[in-house]
Each structure stands twice: as structure tokens, then as C-alpha cells.
């Protein structure tokens, strides 16, 4: 029997890439707020995350088997300017989804972040003490705790992903590829490190964890710690573009930005040990990203 997966934040980058990744093996519904989307083989439905009762009714009537909570307020600068809004969206609404799933006994995949630490140490595991440095990180850390309190069997995923973006929301890799193809120079940070994973790879790994009935917190990231600058260099290499257009820059020199952790890299070994496989390096993910463009996936998402 095909599982029915309901994805909140259905117009977002992660939701769109996730839906395409699993649509051949799952019945997928994208939960939408304002932005309308249309993807072949994927259902859509308007949803109100403000109401637990509404969520219970929607999940129940649609026959949902798994809920992926991918909605969120992710603009770090905007979160700092509007902390109440960030708190409401990232914490309260996430808790509403958790309560609804708990009431119905549904598996919940809650998408968290890697912006949870001070950024002074590399490759942190799930047991390290959280020390977020900005409003966005603080709201995501709080959400993790409330979600697990409301629905202890939830699967909380700390991650940092890349994939193809839409016409209304470019991804980081879109920005790099677009700039290089236009012959424009761009500056990327050499002092910011992370462990990015392709959204498609993330989706596959998470659903395998669901099959294993895993719960609790997991770092679902790539296996390679890399700077934003070197990520751009690797994109240029894989896509056959001019890496000379990428210039090194330092986040530490950009004093006007909201504070961010310099090192967001996470260890994925807990997940890898349970899955019985590694999750690949940056080049693996970028080669697949390139293949996705060739088979039309970038265009399918990009025209939305």
C-alpha cells in the first residue's frame, strides 16, 4: 500500500524537491498557504497551520500516513527584525503540527537546522549542547524541544540542504550557477563551513529512517565539511563553469549582518550507522544536481 505523505510549507524549496524525489513511490500532498504550485503527480491542498483542530481534520480526511513539517521562517535577517513572527511560525506552528500528529498517531518528520550552535567547533553530533547565536537558531532550538514534548516519537532532522529553487525563491546553488553562467563575479565566504546534502538524498535517507521506526534527533547532512567558497568552486567544476569568477570573502568582515555561526558542520554518523550506509560527499550531490537539470527537474521546479 502506497504511503500518503503530507508536506507543510509546500511551496518551499525543500518541499518541492522532496515531493519530486518521492512522488513515484508515495502519494504526496503539498500543504499550501498562499503560493500556488502545480507539479505533475503531486496533489496540493490549502492548509491552516494556526489550528490544531483543522490540521487533525485535514490529516484524517486525507488519509495521511506521514507528515513532513517543512514550513518555516528561514530568513535570518528577517527573523532578527521580527522575532515575534519568527517565534510564532517556527515554534508555535511547529508545535501545532506535532500536537495534531500525536492526536492521530501519525509519524512526524520535523525539519530543523544546523544553526543551533555558537560555531566554534566542527562536526558536532546530536548530543552537543545547543548554543544558538541568533533569533532564527533560538526559535528552531525551542521548536525541537516542544515538538518532542508534544509528540515524543517525532523524527527531528537537523540539516542543511541544496537543490533546485523556484522562480520566486532561488536556492544558494541556483545563485552560484546563475551568476557563473552570466559571467558575473561573486564573493563567497571562506570562513563559513557546513555539511550540505542534496535534498533528494535527504528525502531518501529520512524515509528510510521512518521505515526503521526511528525517532528523536538525527543529523541528516552530507559527509563532507566544506566552506561556502569551496562549495562554489566545486559547483563550477561539476557544471563546467569559470571558477575564476568566484572571489574569496570573509563573513567576519561583514559587520552589518546578523551574527551567524562560522562552523555549522555536523556529524552524520548516528544516522549512517542506523542506515548502514554513508550519505555521500559534496561532489556526489553536485553530480546528481547536474543530472537533475539534464532530465528536466530544474526546469520543472524553476517554472513555478
Q: PLM features: what roles do these ranges have?
A:
Residues 81-109:
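NAD(P)-cofactor binding segment of oxidoreductase domains
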Residues 8, 188-193, 218-226, 274:
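Glycine-rich Rossmann NAD(P)(H)-binding loop
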Residues 205, 212-256, 297-304:
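Mid/C-terminal beta-alpha module of Rossmann-like enzyme folds, strongest
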Residues 49-89:
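NAD(P)H-binding glycine-rich loop region in Rossmannoid oxidoreductase-like domains
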Residues 227-233, 250-289, 293-302:
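Conserved C-terminal active-site "lid" loop/helix of NAD(P)H-dependent oxidoreductases
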Residues 4-23:
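N-terminal Rossmann NAD(P)H-binding glycine-rich loop of SDR-like oxidoreductase domains
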Residues 88, 92-93, 103, 116-157, ...:
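Catalytic helix-loop patch of NAD(P)-dependent Rossmann-fold dehydrogenases
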Amino acid at each position: 500500500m502506497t504511503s500518503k505523505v503530507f508536506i507543510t510549507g509546500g511551496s518551499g524549496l525543500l518541499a518541492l524537491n522532496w515531493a519530486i524525489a518521492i512522488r513515484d513511490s508515495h502519494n504526496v500532498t503539498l500543504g499550501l498557504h498562499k503560493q500556488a504550485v502545480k507539479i505533475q503527480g503531486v496533489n496540493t491542498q490549502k492548509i491552516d497551520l494556526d489550528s490544531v483542530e483543522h490540521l487533525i481534520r485535514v490529516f484524517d480526511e486525507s488519509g495521511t500516513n506521514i507528515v513532513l513539517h517543512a514550513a518555516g521562517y528561514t530568513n535570518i535577517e528577517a527573523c532578527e527584525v521580527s522575532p515575534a513572527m519568527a517565534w510564532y511560525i517556527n515554534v508555535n506552528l511547529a508545535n501545532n503540527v506535532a500536537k495534531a500528529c500525536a492526536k492521530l498517531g501519525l509519524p512526524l518528520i520535523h525539519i530543523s537546522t544546523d544553526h543551533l550552535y555558537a560555531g566554534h567547533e566542527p562536526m558536532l553530533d546530536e548530543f552537543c549542547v545547543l548554543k544558538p547565536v541568533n533569533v532564527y537558531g533560538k526559535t528552531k532550538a525551542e521548536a525541537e524541544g516542544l515538538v518532542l514534548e508534544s509528540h515524543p516519537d517525532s523524527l527531528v532532522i537537523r540539516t542543511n540542504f541544496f537543490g533546485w529553487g523556484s522562480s520566486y525563491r532561488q536556492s544558494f546553488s541556483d545563485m552560484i550557477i546563475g551568476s557563473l553562467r552570466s559571467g558575473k563575479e561573486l564573493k563567497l565566504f571562506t570562513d563559513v563551513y557546513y555539511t550540505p546534502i542534496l535534498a533528494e538524498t535527504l528525502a531518501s535517507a529520512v524515509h528510510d529512517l521512518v521505515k526503521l521506526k526511528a525517532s528523536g534527533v538525527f543529523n541528516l547532512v552530507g559527509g563532507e565539511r566544506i566552506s561556502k567558497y569551496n562549495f562554489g568552486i566545486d559547483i563550477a567544476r561539476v557544471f563546467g563553469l569559470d571558477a575564476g569568477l568566484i572571489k574569496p570573502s570573509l563573513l567576519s568582515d561583514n559587520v552589518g549582518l546578523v551574527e551567524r555561526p562560522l562552523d555549522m558542520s555536523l556529524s552524520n554518523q548516528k544516522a549512517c550507522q542506523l542506515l548502514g550506509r554513508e550519505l555521500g560527499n559534496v561532489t556526489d550531490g553536485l553530480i546528481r544536481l547536474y543530472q537533475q537539470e539534464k532530465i528536466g527537474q530544474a526546469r520543472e521546479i524553476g517554472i513555478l
